[in-house]
A protein has these predicted regions:
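Conserved lysine of the Walker
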Residues: 13
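Conserved substrate/cofactor phosphate-moiety recognition/catalytic segment
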Residues: 18-67
């Protein structure tokens, strides 16, 4: 069984994943780690605002996510902080958020098809108001959230709608859950 945590930036996905990792050793937790894709792309001078470069960047992130999913799927019970659905959403919707009308679906059809074969059994989409997300962002100096404003303004509303249209997705407001209640309810 592969479960995924989703939601906006600073909503508490990693905090929830850390809690599960600390309290249930039967669940293998796979944290977000972009270093494989970033090291593959480093020094190549790619610009995500150019279509060909964007496609190359997304190929690296899609492959990274497929590899991570394969490791998670080999476990009896796994939890992924973000996951293949996140990469699919971002790949398809980021260009429009910066005013581009690129044929991403066509250019990355094979990669997106491979990504969609990464079957998540259930996704928990954590939701919080923009003001709560802003407070959490400001309270966490350990993470670079330079993309936060763009994400909240241009991607999060579309992301919530996109995930609501997917099967096997549950929505939850983590502000109403206390840590001891989180694991038994999920």
């Amino acid at each position: 069984m592969v479960l995924a945590l989703q939601g906006g930036m600073a909503v508490g996905k990693t905090t929830a994943a850390r809690y599960v990792a600390a309290h249930d050793p039967a669940v293998a937790v796979f944290f977000e780690d972009n270093s494989p894709a970033l090291s593959n792309l480093q020094g190549r001078g790619l610009d995500k605002h150019r279509f060909a470069d964007y496609c190359e960047i997304q190929r690296a992130f899609i492959q990274q996510e497929i590899d991570r999913y394969d490791r998670a799927a080999a476990c009896p019970c796994a939890l992924i902080d973000l996951g293949p659905q996140e990469i699919e959403f971002y790949t398809l919707f980021y260009p429009a958020s910066i005013g581009k009308d690129w044929p991403v679906r066509q250019a990355l059809a094979a990669e997106l098809a491979a990504l969609r074969r990464c079957r998540i059994d259930r996704t928990l989409f954590l939701q919080a108001s923009v003001s709560v997300l802003q407070q959490r962002k400001e309270g966490d100096t350990t993470r670079d959230r330079g993309f936060f404003d763009h994400t909240v303004q241009h991607l999060l509303p579309a992301k919530e709608r996109w995930f609501a249209a997917q099967s096997r997705v549950d929505f939850c407001q983590p502000t109403i859950l206390r840590k001891p209640k989180l694991l038994p309810q999920c």
